[in-house]
Amino acid sequence: WLQEQGYLKYSKDDPETVMDIGQGSSAFGMDPSRIYINLKDKYPLGTVDAADYEKIRDEIKAGLEELRYNQSSVIQQVYKKEDLYEGPFLEQAPDLVALSNHGFDLKGKVKADGVFGHSNLVGMHTQDDAFYFASDQSPCRSIFDAKDIILNGLKDEHK
């Protein structure tokens, strides 16, 4: 999308990695759903003046919020970094983070045939599909316990 909208340019016709981002790029994306404004004093091939930062960021945010696929809205919300992050490393945070609607998996893929398509990977991370509550009485758990905890919970539910 960034490339189609003119925000991202590559240094060669068949880019392979983010290292192929070319001069004239005002923004670039990285997995998962992170967008960076290509500031002059921040990145080696930066092109955006600090005075234009908010304008570019707001344009990209508004464009993503309008993105549609088969009349369905792709983006649930686009966050500015100061909405999500704070502290001494705020400047290292992505300038925008896009949260997709269910069914859309946002990628910063360099080798893509278009904005929408399929990949070899199936599935995606979602922010609100699972919840696990632990209390002081719970034994220490690891990720390897998840399967048994879920299956035992489902068995108890069907008794």
Regions found by a protein language model. Give the residues of each.
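Secreted, luminal/periplasmic, and some membrane-associated catalytic domains
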Residues: 1-104
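Short, low-complexity, polar/charged sequence segments that are solvent-exposed and flexible
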Residues: 3-4, 54-57, 115-120, 150-151
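C-terminal accessory region downstream of the catalytic core in glycan-modifying enzymes
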Residues: 48-71, 126-159
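Low-complexity, glycine/alanine/valine/leucine- and proline-rich hydrophobic stretches
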Residues: 97-147
